[in-house]
Amino acid sequence: MNKIFTGCSILVLISFIVSACGASPVIADTTPAAPPSFTASPLPLSTTTETLIPSPVPTATPIPHPLEIRAMRAREYPGSDIVIETVLDPGVNYNRYYISYLSEGLKIYALMTVPMGEKPATGWPVVIFNHGFIRPDVYVSTERYIAYVDLIARSGYIVFRSDYRGHGNSEGEAGGAYSRPDYTVDVLNAVASVKRYPDADPNRIGMWGHSMGGYITLRSMVVTGDIKAGVIWAGVVASYPDLLTRWRRGTGATPTRTPSPSSWRFSLMQQYGSPEENPEFWNSISANSYLGEISGPVQLHHGTLDEDVPLEFSELLFYQMLDAQQYVEFYKYEGDNHNISNYFGQAMQRTIEFFDRYVKFGL
């Protein structure tokens, strides 16, 4: 395992990381291309002595794609009051609830834990928990990620794990995370909802994400300033151009630029062209283009034998965070898989210590 920090000794650390990891990762080009210029052709003159001056043609303001970060920042995420639907069996030192809240008028369900004991004067710190891809037709709120939620909840946090739209009993369509902002919208409304909850401290909110949930976490942290720190395990955290060309699954797989007609890649490329043809668009929908404005420090974890999400994604984000002069920690787990199963205990300890440092105690 390697532990990589950014801080005052960053130049020495970068040298160490490069030698430890092999070839230096390629940083995605986030420089937008200059917009095309437009020159109006003159109209022919009338045969009379009067010269006709053409009226200016109004230029339509392009409608931003819903995935664009500037479009997401312009939206409102009011959330709602939290409704306790079912009281579940408690944990060792925390209560468990099956709750609901509203997101774009949809009733979204979630699992929420609340510590037992006397509440701090400002309320309990919160961790918004973003799960990875689970087929919506088999998703169950109280299954999967049980040990993850338990360890964070035992450490004195409200844990709020949203069932994104179309998952479990949540209303709406499960349209995926990468072609629509829907799941991120549901999470941002979860943030707003938990801020209303009387036992929660609205100024001490962190976010945890695994795989697809890491994508949602990174996007959330460049859209809102409410998230004080983020922890991402095996995250889909590359820029969109890198998602197109570097996301390969399974041993021996190779990058492809020919996505299937049913994929989000094909749909976006058909409408907006490739990243080479339209870099401005692809950068505008990538959270990586906005790391200079991220809401807090980030901790990354990734197994070196992950066959679902490339280790390279976390490596790229690490260097991009450094370039943006943002605080980041990066842990690699030798020989471990997508769920970091072999080093789970150590990774969770580091996760909780990070949240304690930057969320619970606000250092």
What are these regions (language model features)?
Residues 76-122:
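N-terminal cap/lid segment of alpha/beta-hydrolase-fold proteins
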Residues 119-124, 129-171, 239-240:
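Short substrate-entry loop that stabilizes the transition state in hydrolases
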Residues 214-225:
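Short glycine-enriched nucleophile-adjacent loop
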Residues 21-67, 251-260:
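Ser/Thr-rich, Proline-interspersed low-complexity disordered segments
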Residues 294, 300-302, 306:
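Short beta-strand/loop motif that positions the catalytic acidic residue
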